[in-house]
C-alpha cells in the first residue's frame, strides 16, 4: 500500500485554520468582512475574554437561505467568485471560501441567519461537525457566535498572548475596517463595555475622531490626488503629531485594509525631513483602482497585496502628501489645556449625526469661546442637530448628541479663514526679533504672538537646502588642498569604494588610487564647509560602505544633511542683532522652514490670546 494518502476534510480544515485563524482578531476580521460583503449598514461585535471565550458578530445584511447555510461551512465554498476570470477582478473582501470551515474546525459555532423573506435558519457546529440544524426567527441579517476558540487545539491556545494584547489586536482590526467603511456603523464591546462606536454617516473624519480622539482628528489634513489608473484620498497628520511605530499608517485599497512596505515608505517619503528619526505620522489613505491592477490573492489572510504599477502609485502618494504639507503653515501651536467638564464614559455615549460636513478640515487650534477683550476670529454658533434613531440588535444605552459635528463645522470655517491668509502671506510670516534666550533660542514676535526659534535647527535647514542644490551640480569651481588627504581601507572596503568612485565624485568627493588600499584627495568643490573637509569625505565614503546598493539620490541627500550639520550655529552661541535678522530672513526663503533635516521643529508659536490666558487677562 502506498504511503501517500488524502487527508479528510476535518483535518484539512484544521491545517487551513493554522493560516487563516491565527488569533481571535483573525476570526473577528473574517466574520466582519463577511458582514461587510453582505451589504450591512450596522455591524455589532461582542467579545468575552478578548474573543477567546466568545465572539459574537451581528449584522443587518442580506442574510443567507437555508441551503446556503450548510454549504457555507464546506471548504472552498463561496458566493464571491464563480470562475478564474473573477479571481483577477475581486471587488469583495472575502473570496477564498476558507474562513468559515477553518473557524468552525477549531471552535464551537452557532449561526442564525435569514434573508427576511421567510423563516430563518439556525445551525450549530462543534469542531467542524454539524450538531444542530433548525428553523429560527426571521430577522433579516446574520447573528454568528464563535465560542471556546482553539478548544481542540491546545497547543495553539497555549501560545495566545495576554487578554490585553489579544484585545488590542481585535480593536486594531475593527478600527481599520471602520475607517475603510465609514458608511457602516460599527459597535465593538468587550464584556458589555463599549470600545468603539461609529455613526455610519459616511464621513471618515468622524471615524478618525472616534478612534484617535478629537485633538488628533483636528490636526489631520485632507489629501487628494488622481492619475489615469489611481485615485488617492484621505487624511494625514501634521508633522507635530507622530507615533513611535508605523502601526498608525492605514492604507485601504478598494475598501480592503492592506499592508505594503513600498507604499508605507512612499508615505514616509512625503514627510521627508519633517519628522524626527523613529517617529511616524498618523495616516489614512483610501486608494481606488481597477481590481486587475492589484493581486490580493497573495496570502490566506489577504493582508499583503501586490500592485501592477507600484512605482507610479508610490510616486503619486508621495507627491500628494508633499503638496498637502507644503500648502500649510506647519508651526506647532502651544496651547493651554482647559479644565474639561466630566464626560459620559465611552460605553454610555453614542454619536448620531444627520448633517455631514463635506468641506475639507484643517485646524491645529482647539476651539475656545471668543472673549470680548481680544480681537479673535469669530466662531460659529453651535449647529443644533436633530437626533437620529439608530436601530440596535443588542440592548444599548440611550444615544446622546455628540459635539463632534459642531467641532468639524468650526474646523472647516477656521480652514477657510486660514487658507485666505495663506494666499496673502508666505508660509513663514515676517518675524521681528526681540531677544535671545540662553544663547540657543531666538525670541521673535509679530501681530499673531510670540515665536521661539531654535537657532541651530534654523541654520541646519538653511544650509541643508543650499547643499541639496549644490550636491550633484556640475562642479566648475574646485579648491586645491595645500596638503592632500589620504584614506586607507581594508581590501574588501577598498574594492567596494573603488567601484563607486564615480558616484562619490558626483557628490564632490574626488578619490584617486594612491598605493596599496589607499586613496588620495587633492581637491574638493569650493562650496565644501571649510575646516571639515576630511571628516565630511570620510563620512561620505562610509555611507557608500554601509549602503547595500548605492542610490545616487539617497547618497546626495545624506551628503546634504551631513554638510548642513557642520559649522552650524550651536547652543550657547550668542548672536548679534544683524546676525539674528539675517538668519530669520534666510529661514523665510527656504521651502520648508518648519523642521531641520532630521525632522526636529525649528519654530513654535504662542498666540497672543494664549499668552493673555496665561496671565489671566482673559478668562
Swiss-Prot record:
Compositional bias annotation for Basic and acidic residues: 368-378
Spans annotated as Disordered: 368-403
Gene Ontology molecular function: ATP binding; ATP hydrolysis activity; ATP-dependent DNA damage sensor activity; mismatched DNA binding
CDD domains in UniProt: HATPase_MutL-MLH-PMS-like, MutL_Trans
Biological processes annotated in GO: mismatch repair
Keywords: DNA damage, DNA repair
Record function comment: This protein is involved in the repair of mismatches in DNA. It is required for dam-dependent methyl-directed DNA mismatch repair. May act as a 'molecular matchmaker', a protein that promotes the formation of a stable complex between two or more DNA-binding proteins in an ATP-dependent manner without itself being part of a final effector complex.
Family to which the UniProt record says this protein belongs: Belongs to the DNA mismatch repair MutL/HexB family.
Alphabetical list of NCBIfam families matching this protein: mutl, PRK00095.1-3
Record-given protein name: DNA mismatch repair protein MutL
